[in-house]
Amino acid sequence: MIMFPTSTLFIEGCDLSGKTELIKKLHTTMDYKWHIYDRSQISRKAFNELYNRDIRNIKDDYNNEINNLNNRFVILVPTWKTIEKRFKKRGDEIHNILSLKDVYTKFEDVATSLSGLPNVFIPRYDQANIEDSVIMHLDTQEHSLSLSDISDQVFNAVTYSDELEIYSLSFMIYDDCQFEKADDTILTNEVEGEYYTKIMNSLLKKIDDELSGKNEYDRIESSKSRRFVYTDDSCISFIQVAVRDNVMDFHCVLRSSDVENTFQYDLKFLYFLASKCFDRLELESEEINKVRLRFNLNSAHTVQ
């Protein structure tokens, strides 16, 4: 079973939008399942623009946070009438009604501009229980997505970017060691099959050599070795397999990813390759409780 976990859940919106109340309800209902933050780099960037601040590295900070697809963002956009009513009832430590309207308008624009991102969710504000829709959305994201769904999210993130390139994009998935979606037919892919087979043979040979002591130290490595590595200057440029704390970590760096035409196949291949490494290391699911697959796409792009 594949899991696409939430690393950090950010609750966003203008002042008096209901962020604090939603966070309390999510924590209470889900028993603190998620690491939840009130505001993110989205707010920092919005206020930087609204108040003409000059915050160094803000673009990098913003991109690093939002281009990690395990970070998920909920943006609350109530009606202005709702905000105005709350202000009249309890006021605000910072804003008067005019400055509050400026912030509201800014966050309306922000929500519109980010609404197409795969890790941004904007719940309908006329629902009785917004927390239920957030919980349902996150449960779907974490437990019900296929590899194709995940590669679609990567594609959607890139096509939503101004330059049709994200440099860089990252995400992580877990598997329960059963690798139910591993499919060896990926090796017969018309375009990439030969390339995938070359990578697989190279990494598996490296693992075999290290386990049998065929290295410059004539030293037999264990399953916890740091030396199970594949490197190349092609698009899939780095893979490392390591076992730590009852987890098999499978880390991939792709120097260049055509998310429109090939990444969907790359992801299926790398998932399949992780299953082969698990078998080759003779790991048992009783000893290893999960497999963590980490992906760094240094240039996720569409062909232009």
Language model segments and positions:
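Hydrophobic anchor at the beta1->P-loop junction of P-loop NTPases
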Residues: 11
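The conserved Walker
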Residues: 14-15
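Hydrophobic positions on the alpha1 helix immediately C-terminal to the Walker A/P-loop
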Residues: 21-22
